[in-house]
Amino acid sequence: MVLKNLSLLIILFFSTSVFSVSNNLINIPITVVATATGADSKTLSDLKNINGLNLQIPAKCFTKGKLPFLASSDEVRFNCLRDALFDKSDNVVWSLRGGYGSARIIPDLLKLSKPNKEKFFIGYSDITALHLFLSQEWGWRTIHGSNIADLLKTEKDQGNFTKLGEILKGKVKQVTIDNLIPLNDIAKSSDLVKGNLTGGNLTMVQTSIGTRWQIKTKGKILFLEDTNVAPFRLDRELLHLKQSMLLEGVKAIIFGSFGKDLDATMLVLRNFAYSLNIPVFKTNRFGHERINDPIIYNTNSKIIMSKHKEFKLIMEL
């Protein structure tokens, strides 16, 4: 009887915590897209059963293709994304999860004309490929933020979704990321840096190099994050960015989390920062770890230093 009651309490607690999280997203119509790796039927069912969420998860978009690490075939994933971006609804287009596969459908996206209506588009990790396309080709202000499946992950800070909900409902005029730590002397003395934002997952940014959707960095504040990256690999990827001349004209760089940010990882980031003549900052407020604050592409943004010499990123909506 004790075990049975304990089980009921656990179920009740889980249900209540999910409901309180989703409460901030109530009445927001959302179309879920899976442009990369998919999810099992239980994950999809659990998402559909979150009280208060208005999710549209088209079953036709989750038919396995030849490659098991993709949600469905390239054709199906492209068609489902296209339909979500172009339909007449006001639905938010929200990525299910990252993984791998978004870059595979960009050649088809490049054939499309820009739709008449801009929609909110949210996701991160592998979804960086789509952010670069949508922000550069269509001029959209997309949101680098938690994928919708993160709602089911207890290790994620559900405040990530509170902040996203505030943006979607128009409750805020500014979005900020605090606790930027300067990594080089130029950053320490920078009281104001202005520029629109671009970037995302470092691996995907590197993947873009040499493609038709290559990242455009000139005059921008570049933000970068990644996960489970060995220090030597991190150094190699950053070196590639630098030697590709993609850091020429960049206003500043903000590094998010890179896994557990081991001492060796921080050594690589600091060493890289001191090799550049631009301000470089570090924060744990976005990326694959517990906290993933939203960052908005193509917004008027600035990094400011307070009178206490603390730094923050401010994005105007």
UniProtKB/Swiss-Prot annotation:
Species of origin: Rickettsia prowazekii (strain Madrid E)
Q: What is this protein called?
A: Putative carboxypeptidase RP402
Catalytic site: 125 (nucleophile), 225 (charge relay system), 288 (charge relay system)
Return the broad EC class: hydrolase
Hydrolase is among the record's keywords: yes
Which positions carry the signal peptide feature in this UniProt record? Answer: none
User: Gene3D superfamilies per the record?
Assistant: Class I glutamine amidotransferase-like, LD-carboxypeptidase A C-terminal domain-like
Q: According to its UniProt record, which protein family does this protein belong to? A: Belongs to the peptidase S66 family.
Coiled-coil segments, which residues?
none
